[in-house]
Amino acid sequence: MSPGRDFVRAIRDALQPAKAENGRAAREHDSFFESRDAISRFLFVQDDPAPVDLCFVLGCSTPSNMDPAIELFRKGWTPKILISGYGRGHTELPEHELFRRYALERSVPKSALLIEPEATNTLENFTFSKAVIESELGWERIKRVALVTKPFHMRRALMTARGQWPDHLELIALPAKVPGEPLADTWWHNEDGRRYVFAELRAIGAYGLAKNLGRV
């Protein structure tokens, strides 16, 4: 049985406290919750909203991921929103177009939107957008950036930004909370949540081995 499946089974067993009847079982039970909570603290990062020079939104198949960026704009806390991503063909339209239309329908003016139309993965989101920011805004004008992505994806987004973007930036994590998406306090409750989280941990490992990440 694979390590991933072993861990899933350990999760299921640990969620049944009646099995922790002796000292060893109790220690294993406690160890599971410590591991689960450590994973949650590592992956799921969230800051308080604050004024920024740019809001950067990573595309996906769920356009309501735009909501934190739209809220920042409505408050006057960001002058520009950069949407990045073509996607992987899981949507009828490119992800950037889905997000652009979603924002326009919610009264964000076209002049406030920047588009990076080609990225198909997280690394490309940041490497391709780096040139867009330089040409459209200039990095010297950007000091603080809000990152918007799925909650379980935020750690990799932050670390990739640190590895690919200028060192002087202050980064703010604003995860988009969409119904049904894994959250820090629920991801282990179902197979989809566990699958997303384990896949994200593997992806962070792969990005780290490829030297694509920076320290957060």
Enumerate the language-model features and the residues they cover.
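A structural signal for short, hydrophobic/glycine-enriched beta-strand patches
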Residues: 2-189, 193-194
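A structured, mid-to-C-terminal "fold-capping" secondary-structure block
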Residues: 182-216
